[in-house]
Structure formats: structure tokens, C-alpha cells
């Protein structure tokens, strides 16, 4: 029997970064699970850009999505990250408030890590029990 790592409602999030790996992965998960957007968030700290799709412009945003009929998973997909640390901090706080209102117990963020050429999954945890659980699942903890 495998050890349960996460609580009853988990958020998996990805935003652009190194190679947009986190964003691409989160977008893929959301599409594969046929997720529906249920909340949008914006930040005044996003880059001064406007995405255009099919001739329609919109603001950069963070989308919260959920697979239809499920209440145990939220997928966070972001168009961009704020440019300055104060804006990053504020957006992170707003995201955490919204996720708490949906009773999210765990947040897993996806990103790339530049360091080795090996195919390895790296992770960090916020408490020792989670660190042990991640290691037990084959995740290499960053030093």
C-alpha cells in the first residue's frame, strides 16, 4: 500500500519560467483532464503584454481550472509572472487566499531546474514529513 502524500484537495500550478516547462505541464494536465476555468486572476505586476488569439486581445491572467465533476484537484495555469518581487509576493498571497477558500490543503508547483543533464525530478518541501514522502516517491530533494 502506498503512502498518501497529499490532503483532500490539491492544486497543481505552473507559470512561465525556464523554458515555460511549468506552464506547459500545467496546461497539458488541464487539457488532458478536460478541465474548466472557474476563476481568473490578474496582476498589475504582469509584463506590459497583451495576448491575442483569434483576433481578440485580453489581459495576462492566472486561470484556476478543475476537471469537470471533481472537487479534489485545482490546476493553476498562468500566462506570466509578475516582474518585480513586491508584485510576486502580492499575487502569491492572493492566490493562496483564493485556494484556501476552496479548502486546498496542498500546492504543488511545476518548474524547470537548470543544473544537470540527468532526467531527474527535484523537489522541496515545507515540512519534514512531506520531504520524507517526496523522497519515498523517488523525488530528489534539493540541498
Where are the language model's segments positioned?
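Short, glycine/charged-enriched secondary-structure capping and boundary segments
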Residues: 25-27, 90, 121-124
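Residue-level detector of short coil/turn "hinge" positions at structural boundaries
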Residues: 36-37, 106, 141
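Low-complexity, flexible helical/coil segments
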Residues: 45-52, 109-115, 140-143
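N-terminal short beta-loop-beta anion/metal-coordinating cradle
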Residues: 1-80
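Generic secondary-structure signature for well-ordered alpha-helical cores
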Residues: 31-35, 100, 139
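Catalytic cores of processing enzymes, dominated by hydrolases/peptidases
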Residues: 115-143
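Gly/Ser/Thr-rich loops at beta-strand to alpha-helix junctions
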Residues: 15-21, 82-85, 112-118
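Ordered, amphipathic secondary-structure segments that act as subunit-interaction surfaces
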Residues: 69-102, 106-109
Amino acid at each position: 500500500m502506498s503512502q498518501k502524500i497529499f490532503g483532500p484537495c490539491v492544486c497543481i500550478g505552473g507559470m512561465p519560467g525556464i523554458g515555460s516547462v511549468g506552464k506547459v505541464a500545467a496546461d497539458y494536465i488541464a487539457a488532458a483532464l478536460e478541465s474548466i476555468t472557474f476563476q481568473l486572476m490578474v496582476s498589475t505586476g504582469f509584463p506590459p503584454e497583451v495576448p491575442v488569439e483569434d483576433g481578440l486581445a485580453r489581459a495576462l491572467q492566472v486561470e484556476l481550472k478543475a476537471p469537470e465533476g471533481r472537487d479534489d484537484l485545482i490546476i493553476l495555469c498562468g500566462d506570466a509572472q509578475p516582474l518585480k518581487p513586491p508584485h510576486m509576493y502580492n499575487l502569491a498571497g492572493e492566490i493562496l487566499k483564493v485556494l484556501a477558500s476552496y479548502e486546498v490543503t496542498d500546492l504543488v508547483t511545476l518548474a524547470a531546474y537548470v543544473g544537470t543533464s540527468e532526467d531527474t525530478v527535484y523537489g522541496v518541501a515545507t515540512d519534514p514529513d512531506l520531504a520524507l514522502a517526496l523522497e519515498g516517491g523517488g523525488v530528489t530533494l534539493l540541498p
